[in-house]
Amino acid sequence: MEKQYLTVTALTRYIKTKIEYDPHLQSVWLKGEISNFKNHSRGHMYFTLKDENARIAAVMFAGHNRNIKFRPENGMKVLVKGKISVYEASGSYQIYIQDMQPDGIGNLHLAYEQLKVRLEEEGLFSQVYKKTIPPYAKTIGVITSPTGAAIRDIITTIKRRYPIGNVIVFPVLVQGESAAPSIVQAIRTANEMEEIDVLIVGRGGGSIEELWAFNEEMVARAIFKSEIPIISAVGHETDFTIADFVADLRAPTPTAAAELAAPNIIELQEKVLQRTLRLQRAMRELVHKKEEKLQVLQKSYAFRYPRQVYEQKEEQLDRALEQLVLAKERYIDKKVNQLKQLSFYLEKHHPSQKIMQTKVAVETLQKQLQREMQTLLQAKEFAFVRAAQKLEALSPLKVMMRGYGLVYDEEKQVLKSVKDVSLGDAVSVQLQDGILDCSVSGIEERELNNGK
């Protein structure tokens, strides 16, 4: 019988079919530690689940992981639910996760702690960014449920404490999946209204699930970006949400938030009364001091004898005028003398004198330069004539005029000895008026005088 060979693809698909038709592998509850975690740009999560002895590849698609509240990280222990299948391209089996929870700690609690740490590292909780709550807000915005007890407590408290204040309510959902976007939109709408001085954002008490909208990152960032100061009032005094950390001021309850946002009009009236009394007291004291000063002035010599004081001052004025006239004359005399001295100095040091002196000096130097140049030129001309005469005396042409000539070999080199030629060599003889081409037909060597 001929053997049937399977392709790798066929075998892999067969194994995949076997696994996917196994009911025990289509609903698997698994716990392990996350490693090699990667969050794809399309939202899918890829990682490995492992324990001490084994590991399995894991995939959680975006459609499932968008519902988890915490952020998976390497080293985190988790509980997952999913199904086992085979990834044909690599031939490896892996778990496709449908739900994931942290192992040993609540899902929402872990998400809360992770977001709290991350936003704190970004500086969203820093006191540097906290805005001051206005002490006398004219218009107070309230972002909460329109039907809960919180809105009734807030409005009742504001109207009781500050009946002249305005309240604008922004009704929102305070729990459920749509609550966070609803709160964010209300904060943005309030910031577009110029008349609002302060915002209260909150709701009544509840479980962590019911309060979760105020732990959402989008709500925290909307509070941080708000130009209007925000007072958070979420739950009871023991409840702390992310919104409380980001807000400019945290109130333990909605009623307390209303008390922080709205001043007590009775206390304000008491302050106005106290300041009015202090102002009246200060005015009375000022009037009393002025009256005492007036009485002193009325008893003074100037007030009792104004004519004598006038005459004395008139005499002082006359003397002052005389001194002023004398001082003016002395000042003018002094300036006239200074002007004369400056005129004399200027005349003595007038530039025309220096220009004349410089002109004479330049003319003298010019004449001297001309004389020296003439002398130098004559000396150079005399030296040139003598040098020309010496050069002419040494010129070969002078020698040739006395009957001498220069003999050259075929290479136009001057012959200095009969030893430089041989019989039959062609030579040239240069005379003063031309050149003779000759041939050596005989050589007669002579001894030079003095043995040279």
Curated annotation (Swiss-Prot):
Keywords: Cytoplasm, Exonuclease, Hydrolase, Nuclease
Molecular function (Gene Ontology), one example: nucleic acid binding
Keyword Hydrolase listed: yes
Subcellular location: Cytoplasm
Assigned GO CC terms: cytoplasm; exodeoxyribonuclease VII complex
Domain of life: Bacteria
Main location: cytoplasm
Catalytic activity: Exonucleolytic cleavage in either 5'- to 3'- or 3'- to 5'-direction to yield nucleoside 5'-phosphates
Listed EC numbers: 3.1.11.6
Biological process annotations from GO: DNA catabolic process
Assembly and interaction partners: Heterooligomer composed of large and small subunits.
Similarity comment: Belongs to the XseA family.
Annotated function: Bidirectionally degrades single-stranded DNA into large acid-insoluble oligonucleotides, which are then degraded further into small acid-soluble oligonucleotides.
Name the UniProt record assigns to this protein: Exodeoxyribonuclease 7 large subunit
Lineage: Bacteria, Bacillati, Bacillota, Bacilli, Bacillales
The encoding gene: xseA
